[in-house]
A protein has these predicted regions:
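Long, charge-dense, low-complexity tracts
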Residues: 1-118
């Protein structure tokens, strides 16, 4: 069972929130990052005895949302000066690509867990 985040009018798993941002059905500016962090810390506390891989996947998604929002809040001059390494998310399109990549690895991970449990 996935942890349910409650943010503004949204309630559901973090990967659904990322999907809504990715498909422009939810505006990143409407997301209170402080709430995501608080919810994530609650999740970590409740899951600390369980699978660290699950906790780390939520951390990656939360970090991507935080990074995208911070980039969107930076003025255009600073955006041009920002580094352009492979981990940098400088636009909503970059976030969409990262989410698609995350979803691919999440499915692979789930398949590996199923194989391991057989």
């Amino acid at each position: 069972m996935e942890y349910q985040f409650s943010i503004n009018d949204f309630e559901g798993p973090l990967d659904l929130l990322l999907h809504l941002v990715k498909t422009s059905k939810m505006n990143i500016y409407d997301i209170n990052i402080k709430i995501i962090i608080e919810e994530y810390l609650k999740f970590i506390e409740s899951e600390k005895e369980k699978n660290i891989d699950i906790a780390s996947s939520y951390l990656v998604m939360a970090a991507e949302l935080i990074h995208l929002k911070s980039k969107m809040l930076v003025n255009d001059e600073e955006k041009e000066e920002a580094s352009d390494d492979e981990f940098s998310i400088t636009s909503e399109e970059d976030l969409k690509r990262k989410i698609i990549e995350y979803e691919k690895y999440k499915k692979i991970s789930e398949s590996l867990v199923e194989l391991e449990n057989k």
